[in-house]
Amino acid sequence: MTNSETLAMFKSSGALLDGHFKLTSGRHSNSYFQCAKVLQYPEYLSAICGEIAAHFRDSGITTVISPAIGGIVVGTEVGRQLGVKTIFAERKEGTMMIRRGFSIDPSEQVLVVEDVITTGGSVVEVMEQVKAAGATVAGVASVVDRSNGKVKLADKQFSLLMMEVVSYAPEECPLCKEGLPIDAPGSRSNAQG
């Protein structure tokens, strides 16, 4: 699947938004990828996650883990297509943790799956949890990489849609300087304001 084919799925499902957004990373942008809107359609979910699963099929993956909340749907479907255990990490009091009775054994080869990577912060936190369990991070995957490959998180890393989408530190944001209202649609928007 090409970048343009993936982008067409986002556009046709209304998942690529234009405006003034506060991203989960805290940075600001004029574009927002609302993956949930494209992933709500089973044919898109299956196709997108099938591409990710195919990329890692021969990598010995035994577990897929995703950061909550955005990565859960993608991670679950990738895990289903790979036929492996699928879990997620979530924040408790601001810290990413493996909870809900989930566990990782030191022998596991773990694929970290996220919906959108901007700075990679959530993925890094999940990777730290995997390493703390003594397991191996065998790869990182995402549906969208907003850095167009500039954010390098693992030796084996794959993103279906690679685009360089400009983002700004809040104090440097030209959209803020223009006085445009900001929207914070990300999964941490309520917790971070």
UniProtKB/Swiss-Prot annotation:
GO molecular function: magnesium ion binding; orotate phosphoribosyltransferase activity
Matches recorded under SUPFAM superfamilies: PRTase-like
Signal peptide: none
Keywords: Glycosyltransferase, Magnesium, Pyrimidine biosynthesis, Transferase
UniProt key word Transferase: yes
Binding site for orotate: T118, R146
Enzyme class, first EC level, given as a word: transferase
Catalytic activity: orotidine 5'-phosphate + diphosphate = orotate + 5-phospho-alpha-D-ribose 1-diphosphate
Family: Belongs to the purine/pyrimidine phosphoribosyltransferase family. PyrE subfamily.
Function: Catalyzes the transfer of a ribosyl phosphate group from 5-phosphoribose 1-diphosphate to orotate, leading to the formation of orotidine monophosphate (OMP).
PANTHER family named among the record's database cross-references: OROTATE PHOSPHORIBOSYLTRANSFERASE, URIDINE 5'-MONOPHOSPHATE SYNTHASE
Name this protein carries in UniProt: Orotate phosphoribosyltransferase
Organism: Chlorobaculum parvum (strain DSM 263 / NCIMB 8327) (Chlorobium vibrioforme subsp. thiosulfatophilum)
